[in-house]
A protein has these predicted regions:
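Beta-rich, aromatic/charged-enriched effector core domains that present basic-aromatic interfaces
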Residues: 1-114
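Catalytic cores of enzymes that engage adenine nucleotides and/or redox cofactors via long glycine-rich
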Residues: 73-168
């Protein structure tokens, strides 16, 4: 944040709540302190049914199902000019080129690809999910294959849940 704030005036910081490990908890505390010192409004949004700071899990599942069944917000963001932020740790040109050449053996990226995997899961591949999930070879062809899309934020857990729920 400090390096970005040297290039831009930051008034608001937007992020989503996550559950993680001690490292991410400590990071969040440091971000909160930084925002307080610099008078930055930090807006954290709930995502994937995460409940932070609960004393126990009583009622957690009910809250999760309510969250998963709530309407999905439609993204109306329009393309803006890219923001140029100079990295204090620039990549070597050769490594940057390698990273820009997306390997064909990887799952295709993006939201459309995520929904294609979900569609193939509910229309056939998922039929043997319970039987094959613990089998290394068979699980590749019967599991959802949506982890990368969830990890990179191409789709949300709520979108995946509602898709499977509505197609079952």
């Amino acid at each position: 944040l400090e390096s970005i704030s040297k290039q831009y005036e930051i008034r608001n910081l937007f992020s989503y709540q996550e559950s993680g490990i001690q490292l991410t908890y400590n990071r969040d505390k440091a971000v909160a302190e930084y925002c307080k010192i610099k008078d930055i409004s930090w807006h954290q949004y709930q995502r994937d049914g995460i409940l932070r700071g609960i004393q126990n899990r009583s009622g957690w599942d009910k809250h999760w199902f309510v969250t998963m069944h709530s309407p999905i917000i439609q993204n109306t963001f329009s393309v803006q000019q890219p923001l140029s932020i100079e990295s204090p740790y620039p990549l070597q040109h050769e490594l940057e080129q390698q990273l820009n050449n997306y390997p064909n053996q990887f799952q295709p990226a993006g939201e459309d690809a995520a929904f294609k995997y979900l569609e193939s899961f509910v229309s056939g591949r998922g039929l043997l999910y319970s039987k094959n999930i613990s089998k290394p070879l068979e699980s590749r062809t019967s599991c959802g294959r949506i982890s990368p899309y969830l990890s990179w934020g191409n789709i949300s857990v709520r979108q995946a849940y509602q898709f499977v729920y509505n197609h079952s």
